[in-house]
Design a protein with these regions (language model features):
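Histidine-anchored nucleotide/phosphate-binding helix
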Residues: 68-84, 88
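N-terminal beta-loop-helix "entrance" segment that forms/cooperates
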Residues: 95-106
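Solvent-exposed loop/turn segments at secondary-structure junctions
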Residues: 62-64, 93-96, 138-142
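Short, glycine-rich nucleotide/cofactor-binding loops
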Residues: 50-51, 56-70, 98
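A glycine-rich helix N-cap at a beta->alpha junction
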Residues: 106-138
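Short acidic-hydrophobic, aromatic-tinged amphipathic segments that line or gate anion-handling sites
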Residues: 112-113, 153-159
Length: 181
């Protein structure tokens, strides 16, 4: 094997020069903070609920594995604020979104920014009048207990998933079903 032709010091110097060159290629910040980079025209009307309308959300998504569960909660909250009767049903692995025991190093702490977003969003949804159901079997699959649930979340029998869907469909609910593998 041939001996290196450049010393570690020369390599480090070349790396530093390349970093400086890379940083200088595009001016930063490219746009000042607050610059609009997207239009703001809303295409559809800002619909509000008509008397008796219902919005039902099914969530089968794992907390923090993607934004699926969090966005579903935000959508259900928006529907609630538009005047819809709004309910969320967490089933399967989605049930673990409902635990109050999330946190690191202690319950309620955020081990990373946003760790408590789901808990806080669910507490807000419940406080504003939304109903939240959590499948007991989904909880059991992940070692969560009913006493671990966020206050106000309603534990539900596994067979209630289908019957809740039938119930809300018969009420004419708009049904938002999310699913994550």
């Amino acid at each position: 094997m041939a001996a290196p032709t450049t010393s570690p010091t020369e390599i480090e110097k070349q790396i530093e020069e390349n970093i400086a060159k890379s940083l200088a290629e595009i001016p930063h910040p490219a746009l000042p903070q607050g610059t609009n980079i997207y239009g703001s025209t809303k295409i559809f009307p800002d619909y509000q609920a008509e008397a008796g309308e219902t919005y039902f959300t099914l969530v089968h998504g794992i907390a923090h594995e993607s934004s699926v569960s969090f966005v579903a909660i935000l959508q259900a909250t928006r529907a609630l604020r538009k005047g819809f009767e709004s309910a969320i049903y967490f089933y399967g692995p989605g049930a673990i979104n409902c635990v109050a025991t999330r946190g690191f190093p202690t319950t309620g702490d955020s081990g990373f920014p946003g760790e408590q977003n789901i808990n806080q969003a669910l507490a807000t949804f419940i406080k504003e009048g939304g109903k939240v159901f959590a499948c007991r079997f989904g909880l059991a699959l992940h070692g969560a207990r009913e006493e671990d649930l966020i206050e106000g979340i309603i534990p539900a029998h596994p067979l209630d998933v289908q019957d809740a869907l039938i119930h809300y469909a018969r009420k004419g609910a708009i049904i938002n079903s999310t699913y994550q593998l």
